[in-house]
Amino acid sequence: MATMISNLPRDLIEEIFSRVPLTSMKAVRLTCKSWNNLSKSESFTKVHIGRAATREEKTMIVDVMPHKLNLMSIVIDDVTPSAEFKGQFSLLHKNYRINQVLHYEGLLLCIMKDPTRIVVWNPYLGQTRWIQLRYFHRPHGIDHFRYALGYADKESCSSLKFLRFLDYFYKAPEEEFFWYEIYDFDSGLWTTLNVTPHWGIYSTCPCVSLKGNTYWPAKERSTQGFQDYIIRFDFTRERFGPLLALPTDRESSFVSLSCVKEEKLAALFKHRLHHDSYEYEFEIWITTKIEVEMVSWSKFLRMDMRPKMELPLTFYIDEEKKVFMGFDHGEYPKLLFLNVVGETGFLRKFENIQYRSPCSYVPSLVQVKKLARDRLRKQRSLENRRFAQNILRLARNGKS
């Protein structure tokens, strides 16, 4: 007697359906109510999204809402780009509220509404690691710390590390204050970094992590100029590198960075077309080579955006298809639009996207390990003194 597929065990049905292409899932959902419910379950989503991301040509976009992760795929074809909501992952409990999220190789660094701790989350594996912060600084409810996630290369493995810093470089010299510290996932210890910054990184500039290191748009600390450089933090050496020049020789009122397949950096520039106008054009450049002390660039795309698109909050590119994807609010601050632009101009505008802070996403098998009890260590007395000195300096400068 033949067995009907609906009578098979749930885990076997999930395994079968996980091999169905994303573009064919609509037919599966319409077959019956139970299959529709199964296709939206968290256990099925983990398996299906993981396989689909490597099987199909698409860009996966995620957005962390207060306590959950939404997933959307964008497919760029030769006819019409398409977007589809793919599912959700939940972060433990609804009481955990997320303010900000940074993405790195399938891991999410979540800055919580609770100012005393953060969480590193692999939604694909369902693993989390909570980190207790030594101090928080949120005057008027605004978090002035900046954050980055990366890893240090060791002989046999890679070790996750977490950087955060506070830097009031735009103050008068006598009022300047900076504090850079790093957290080691293996030891569970904080270390105050001995740095004298020659750079300035604005708090509104998001970072990009690539091959274990993190990059920011930056400026020379001693000047009032634009962000004409990028700067890298090396998690293995635990130090910043030199300022590396950006490729444009035009004054840019805005610079943003993105990753290209976890292999290259992309830089987006916003240029004013005329000194007396508010019309702009965008340029995108991609790195052809990037090392500790040098970087080379190649122009990818130029876009005259008047009047179709505002300043992109986040952007991604498909290098092979010569396509740009950027999110902006347009004239409606409560709505979000996704603009898809190619060499020939606008391809499509997706309206009313229900995303707050979207970023690209590829499911990852990177382990977020818990700190073993037998490896618990106490902070050294020297580090405790450095921490106390920074707290005192911060209070004296009137910024606590």
UniProtKB/Swiss-Prot annotation:
Name the source's superkingdom. Answer: Eukaryota
The record lists the membrane-crossing segments as: none
Boundaries of every F-box domain copy: 2-47
Q: Coiled-coil regions in this chain?
A: none
Q: Which cysteines are joined by disulfide bonds?
A: none
Tell me which InterPro entries the record gives.
Answer: F-box-assoc_dom_typ1 (IPR006527), F-box-assoc_interact_dom (IPR017451), F-box-like_dom_sf (IPR036047), F-box_dom (IPR001810), SCF_F-box_component (IPR050796)
Indicate what this protein is called per its UniProt record. Answer: Putative F-box protein At5g41510
Species name for this entry?
Answer: Arabidopsis thaliana
